[in-house]
């Protein structure tokens, strides 16, 4: 089993560690400083406050005939263009996106895309990965065939995740799942951009209340249009009263979980999150016309 991780950021590096330690033939595609760091030092990561190292193959160019069983990538359109002529059959996309999967398949060919989303977060500081998987009950690694069907390759992916001890879930409609995910993460990230002191945004009652209102609005619209939410627990944003939702949000932003899985990404990728904000709000605005 050969697996290529396209992109050596926090998420790619964490999955590379887990897959390599589980015994899979794992390669990372990297560029720039990260490429140099991995080539010179190996993949350094923190586990239980101890710095460890995994030696892993690193490449900065992919041959067309260099075939992998699965390719995981998160830098979407650049990656798809580079992977277009490669002969590997399975490309697992792990990105926040509102685009249709047909648009992706128009680049690499029909039947190669297996949409997914990671359940992880953390940071890389001084070339050392400090990251962890999201608790299963909050957000496991999520995936589905575009058709929603269970196939040989989804079963193969399940076995990989089980062997690597990566929590996972297979859903029926990945596009609906991603719409609901964006309906949640866009307001959560927006909160940090609405205050002068993002690290302590959980103490800002007005921002917390506005975030609760935005979440409630998003999921009201999503449910009206889709007639379902995925995962089912997203209904909590529709059902809970604003004061209770505000209280829960405040506690979440103040927590270690909030810092690791929400704050770090929102602060390090504001351009990405603001673009997703624009895309998501334009998308649901069309439903209201």
Task: For every predicted segment, state its role.
Residues 3, 25-26, 91, 113, ...:
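Hydrophobic anchor at the start of a short beta-strand
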Residues 130-144, 193-203, 256-268:
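Helix-loop-beta segment of a Rossmann-like dinucleotide-binding subdomain
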Residues 1-51:
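NAD(P)+-binding Rossmann beta1-loop-alpha1 motif at the extreme N-terminus of oxidoreductases
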Residues 98-179:
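Rossmann-fold dinucleotide-binding core
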Residues 216-289:
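NAD(P)-dependent Rossmann-like dehydrogenase/reductase catalytic/cofactor-binding core
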Residues 50-130:
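Rossmann-like NAD(P)(H) cofactor-binding subdomain of soluble oxidoreductases
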Residues 12, 150, 154, 207-215, ...:
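Generic structural signal for well-ordered, non-membrane alpha-helical segments
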Residues 175-202, 206-219:
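Active-site-proximal catalytic alpha-helix in oxidoreductases
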